[in-house]
């Protein structure tokens, strides 16, 4: 249930859609399985496999985007097209020209696509209409952009802004390391990366290793800045903050994993319980993280 990698955005206006209106918007761009004539297709699927495209609970909305990609190697298309071209050459007495070869490859692609294997990738989206967050569970910017691209088509207009803070994460993390002091309610963990800003981009990394403060200060004095820092919030959630304000490797600690009601809950109740826990904890984490970076910057 817990999102692992957070791409964070702001809702710039109050959420205006009710449940039925949101379902109607999502249905227009629902994933259509079995479309055999496209290399890639995108669409919304049910987060709970219950038919509803949005799972809504106490102002928290969960969506899932499915991306299907056909596996059709260019070498396979070229091999079949080459064989077809030889047949045509025998029939017409001369080799197909460039335009004709292009048409042959297009026909071959159309013939092979229905037989090609597909790979599927699901990306989850959390919309917090209470605290005005929109969070995508994606490690790569390209995947987040894919989601945003379909979201703006699905919900028009979509009240969405990038998140900006007063102090850059790199400057803040560098300051915390130099002072050997984390902001209130946070602690610094054992993974970090410091990187030079010049052409060399030389980097030093601590991986599951206690940070030597004097060593880190020497690197900072030589011009390096912190670009990744492992932290824990409130002894409840661990994560890695990056220079681009991404929050990666999010993990609830043991205190949050203990659910005394789990044994008596059915699947739906457990899902809702996990969703309530995650959205509540991460919303508070994000608010305090933004505060530790000087607050939100209005642009």
Curated annotation (Swiss-Prot):
Family: Belongs to the RdgC family.
Keywords tagged on the record: Cytoplasm, DNA recombination
Compartments where located: Cytoplasm, Nucleoid
InterPro entries listed in its UniProt record: RdgC
Molecular-function GO term, any one: double-stranded DNA binding
Protein purpose: May be involved in recombination.
NCBIfam families: PRK00321.1-4, PRK00321.1-5
PANTHER family registered for this protein in UniProt: RECOMBINATION-ASSOCIATED PROTEIN RDGC
GO cellular component, one term: bacterial nucleoid
Source organism (scientific name): Bordetella pertussis (strain Tohama I / ATCC BAA-589 / NCTC 13251)
Gene Ontology biological process terms, A to Z: DNA recombination; regulation of DNA recombination
Protein name: Recombination-associated protein RdgC
Coiled coil: none
């Amino acid at each position: 249930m817990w999102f692992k990698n957070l791409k964070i955005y702001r809702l710039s206006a109050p959420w205006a859609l009710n449940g039925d209106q949101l379902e109607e918007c999502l249905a227009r761009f629902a994933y259509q399985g079995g479309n055999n004539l496209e290399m890639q297709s995108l669409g919304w699927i049910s987060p709970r496999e219950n038919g509803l495209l949005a799972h809504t609970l106490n102002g928290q909305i969960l969506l899932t985007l499915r991306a299907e990609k056909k596996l059709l190697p260019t070498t396979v298309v070229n091999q079949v097209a080459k064989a077809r071209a030889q047949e045509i050459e025998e029939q017409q007495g001369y080799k197909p020209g460039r335009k004709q070869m292009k048409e042959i490859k297009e026909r071959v692609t159309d013939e092979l696509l229905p037989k090609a294997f597909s790979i599927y990738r699901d990306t989850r989206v959390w919309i917090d209409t209470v605290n005005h967050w929109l969070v995508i569970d994606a490690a790569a910017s390209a995947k987040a952009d894919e989601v945003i691209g379909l979201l703006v088509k699905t919900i028009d207009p979509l009240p969405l802004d990038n998140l900006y803070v007063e102090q850059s994460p790199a400057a803040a993390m560098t300051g915390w390391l130099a002072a050997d002091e984390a902001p209130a309610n946070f602690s610094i963990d054992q993974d970090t990366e410091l990187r030079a800003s010049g052409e060399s981009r030389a980097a030093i990394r601590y991986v599951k290793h206690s940070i030597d403060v004097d060593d880190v200060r020497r690197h900072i004095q030589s011009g390096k800045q912190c670009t990744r820092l492992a932290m824990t919030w409130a002894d409840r959630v661990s994560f890695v903050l990056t220079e681009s304000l991404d929050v990666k490797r999010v993990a609830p600690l043991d205190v949050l994993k203990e659910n005394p009601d789990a044994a008596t809950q059915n699947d739906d109740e457990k899902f809702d319980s996990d969703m309530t826990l995650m959205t509540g904890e991460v919303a508070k984490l994000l608010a305090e993280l933004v505060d530790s970076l000087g607050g939100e910057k209005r642009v």
